[in-house]
Amino acid sequence: MSNAAIRMEQLMLPTYPEPGKEEMPLFSEHRVHQRSTGRPYPNKVTLEVNRERKIERSYTVVHLENEYLDVLVLPEIGGRIFAARDKVTDYDFFYRQHVIKPGLIGALGSWISGGVEFNWPYHHRPSGFLPCDFETEECGDGSVIC
């Protein structure tokens, strides 16, 4: 394979769905999150976790691949790099989760471990568990962009 490939796929993962979000984010303003204060408005905040009910859920995955790397990006969960594998050594070089089980670590509540997430303006950013917009492009030189 001389060129990189990019494709959209569906990935089934065991998932613990988020419970309902706080309908009045004003009441979450005093929830301190790792030294950053509240004020989530206009975003709703998840204040609980679900540990009882697990479902199988399909996620849209952007799959990028060349002869050396195999990378999965989850745009539905903040655009995080969900998995990245070195094809030469068959080694996952980031921790790869095999279940989506949110904890209350994110700025708006839900957050998952594993992979790599873009963190701005601070760690476990507010949109880390929200869907993100994305585009894919196949370039003339054989590279791909997501």
Spans of model-derived segments:
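A broad, low-specificity signal marking well-ordered, structured residues that form hydrophobic/aromatic
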Residues: 6, 62, 71, 82, ...
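Intrinsically disordered, low-structural-confidence terminal and linker regions
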Residues: 1-20
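Active-site-surrounding "flap" and adjacent substrate/cofactor-binding loops of secreted or lumenal enzymes
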Residues: 88-108
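A short, sequence-level motif marking secondary-structure junctions
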Residues: 12-15, 74-81, 98-102
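Short N-terminal helix-initiation segments at or just after the protein's N-terminus
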Residues: 6-10, 108-119
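Extended, loop-rich substrate-binding clefts of extracytoplasmic carbohydrate-active enzymes
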Residues: 26-56, 61-65, 113-146
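Primarily extracytoplasmic ectodomains and periplasmic/lumenal surface modules that are beta-strand-rich
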Residues: 69-72, 78-82, 89-92
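Active-site beta-strand termini and strand-to-loop segments that position acidic
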Residues: 64-67, 86
